[in-house]
């Protein structure tokens, strides 16, 4: 893959039809892009080494060892060597973690990520901070977020993880999923369990977690907008009633909508500045999300797009809805029973592409609509759904 003036076009790798190269390119792209959260840039040597790994010439471990050796033997010292060394080593470590398939949703995993990400960079890698911290933020005009107390860090992490582990995503549409994920991720970040490297560690943990619950997050959002991601986390956790500033997850939600739903919300750091001058204020046209017809990044194992329905109020061209209506018929089915009836296993994707569209278009309803989380909740066809089912049973060719 060609390079021009030290620039690597990582996105080209996703278009060449070689999945392994595309995966390695995504890992390096994200790893390099995340250095921007601390104002760091990688060296040209790192970029050249990354390309060698992407092309399959060397392994990721060989790439990391080359980077380590490069700084050990470098004789021509430059003023920014220390910063470059951190960026290069951390990029290699992050690329390795992202490329790995294993993941465990736990506090030890988060701590382990920090240790492996900053191995050879921070002496305190993998250690919870022993003191309280403040950080002046540009986006807050020099003010700081209130971070977690040093005495409570592990307890706070365990609590947030357990709350997320127990959270039930069933029945949620993607708007609700994004809103919840934004709150969870911002909560973990607000604890700020480490002395340094919290945002990079949080980003890597988030990527691995999203993948573990079925999302494809290989669209380079973390690579291109890592600084925005950090500032959005700041705004989601900052409140100053005296100055009229409330916690605002809107910016983080826009990031996740772009990441998970394929939207194209404008991600500009200046829009997040608290009490901005008029020329930097968010234009009215950017406050609303830009909807996409279907999410561009979604859990795998079901159709990659939601077919649009036609204009008739009693039928639809959406094959997912047709399949679900046919499966339910005159029965009342639980979510688990519906998954079995349509032959799918990925619950979140089924919700996004089949059940939610069927309910929003009025073909399927809840048996207990006033109690969505009823322990014996079932789903059944509406009058409209029954009319469609009758048509389908008369003309089975519509399902083909």
Regions found by a protein language model. Give the residues of each.
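FIC/Doc superfamily catalytic core
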Residues: 1-400
């Amino acid at each position: 893959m060609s390079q021009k003036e030290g620039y690597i076009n990582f996105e080209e790798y996703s278009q060449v039809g070689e999945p392994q190269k595309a995966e390695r390119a995504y890992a390096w792209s994200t790893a390099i892009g995340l250095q921007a959260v601390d104002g760091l840039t990688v060296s040209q040597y790192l970029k050249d080494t990354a390309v060698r790994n992407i092309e399959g010439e060397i392994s990721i471990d060989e790439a990391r060892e080359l980077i380590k050796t490069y700084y050990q033997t470098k004789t021509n010292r430059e003023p920014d060597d220390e910063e470059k060394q951190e960026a290069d080593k951390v990029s290699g470590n992050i690329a390795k973690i992202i490329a790995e398939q294993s993941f465990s949703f736990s506090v030890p995993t988060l701590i382990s990520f920090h240790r492996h990400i900053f191995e050879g960079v921070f002496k305190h890698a993998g250690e919870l901070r022993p003191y309280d911290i403040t950080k002046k933020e540009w986006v807050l005009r020099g003010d700081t977020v209130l971070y977690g107390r040093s005495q409570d860090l592990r307890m706070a992490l365990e609590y947030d993880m357990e709350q997320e582990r127990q959270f039930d995503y069933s029945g949620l549409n993607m708007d609700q999923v994004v809103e919840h994920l934004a709150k969870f991720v911002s909560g973990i970040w607000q604890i700020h369990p480490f002395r340094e490297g919290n945002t990079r560690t949080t980003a890597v943990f988030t990527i691995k977690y999203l993948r573990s619950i079925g999302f494809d997050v290989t669209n380079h959002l973390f690579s291109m907008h890592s600084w925005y991601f950090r500032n959005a986390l700041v705004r989601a956790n900052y409140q100053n009633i005296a100055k009229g500033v409330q916690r605002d997850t809107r910016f983080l939600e826009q990031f996740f909508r772009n990441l998970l739903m394929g939207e194209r919300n404008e991600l500009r750091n200046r829009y997040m500045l608290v009490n901005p001058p008029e020329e930097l204020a968010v234009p009215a046209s950017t406050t609303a999300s830009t909807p996409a017809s279907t999410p561009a990044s979604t859990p795998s194992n079901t159709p990659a797009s939601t077919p649009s329905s036609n204009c008739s109020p009693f039928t639809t061209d959406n094959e997912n809805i047709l399949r679900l209506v046919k499966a339910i018929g005159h029965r009342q089915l639980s979510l688990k029973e519906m998954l079995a009836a349509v032959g799918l296993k990925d619950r979140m994707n089924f919700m996004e592409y089949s059940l939610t569209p069927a309910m929003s278009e009025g073909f399927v309803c809840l048996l207990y609509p006033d109690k969505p989380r009823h322990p014996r909740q079932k789903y059944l066809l509406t009058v409209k759904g029954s009319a469609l089912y009758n048509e389908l049973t008369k003309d089975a060719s519509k399902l083909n």
